[in-house]
Amino acid sequence: MTTSQKHRDFVAEPMGEKPVGSLAGIGDALGKRLEERGFDKAYVVLGQFLVLKKDEDLFREWLKDTCGANAKQSRDCFGCLREWCDAFL
């Protein structure tokens, strides 16, 4: 699987205070929906990812239900967070 530049940029460094839109798969529309639901920073979405025990099906379903992410968007976001965790946790 090839990854986007956005994905590579995200996983290349600590998360810090990056906005939710910095996550691969999360564009302006999904980012706005997530922000409206309290997920304004990438680390808040990471928290949900960890609460769901890094389970791909559960996380992708949550992302779909929370902000309307499609299959590609949820797959990209999951892969981004999984790779970030492998590098930094």
Swiss-Prot record:
Swiss-Prot/TrEMBL GO biological process terms: chromatin organization; chromosome organization; DNA integration; mitotic nuclear membrane reassembly; negative regulation of cGAS/STING signaling pathway; negative regulation of innate immune response; negative regulation of protein ADP-ribosylation; negative regulation of type I interferon production
PTM description: Ser-4 is the major site of phosphorylation as compared to Thr-2 and Thr-3. Phosphorylation on Thr-2; Thr-3 and Ser-4 disrupts its ability to bind DNA and reduces its ability to bind LEM domain-containing proteins. Non phosphorylated BAF seems to enhance binding between EMD and LMNA. Dephosphorylated by protein phosphatase 2A (PP2A) following interaction with ANKLE2/LEM4 during mitotic exit, leading to mitotic nuclear envelope reassembly.
Residue ranges of domain HhH in the record: 20-35
Gene Ontology CC: one annotated term: condensed chromosome
Molecular-function annotations in GO: DNA binding; double-stranded DNA binding; identical protein binding; protein homodimerization activity
Hydrolase keyword on record: no
Record InterPro entries: BAF (IPR051387), BAF_prot (IPR004122), BAF_sf (IPR036617)
Phosphoserine modification, residue list: 4
PTM sites of type N-acetylmethionine: 1
Phosphothreonine: modified positions: 2-3
Modified residues (N-acetylthreonine): 2
Keywords: Acetylation, Chromosome, Cytoplasm, DNA-binding, Nucleus, Phosphoprotein
Family recorded in the similarity comment: Belongs to the BAF family.
Subunit and partners: Homodimer. Heterodimerizes with BANF2. Interacts with ANKLE2/LEM4, leading to decreased phosphorylation by VRK1 and promoting dephosphorylation by protein phosphatase 2A (PP2A). Binds non-specifically to double-stranded DNA, and is found as a hexamer or dodecamer upon DNA binding. Binds to LEM domain-containing nuclear proteins such as LEMD3/MAN1, TMPO/LAP2 and EMD (emerin). Interacts with ANKLE1 (via LEM domain); the interaction may favor BANF1 dimerization. Interacts with CRX and LMNA (lamin-A). Binds linker histone H1.1 and core histones H3. Interacts with LEMD2 (via LEM domain).
Protein's job: Non-specific DNA-binding protein that plays key roles in mitotic nuclear reassembly, chromatin organization, DNA damage response, gene expression and intrinsic immunity against foreign DNA. Contains two non-specific double-stranded DNA (dsDNA)-binding sites which promote DNA cross-bridging. Plays a key role in nuclear membrane reformation at the end of mitosis by driving formation of a single nucleus in a spindle-independent manner.
Protein name: Barrier-to-autointegration factor
Gene: Banf1
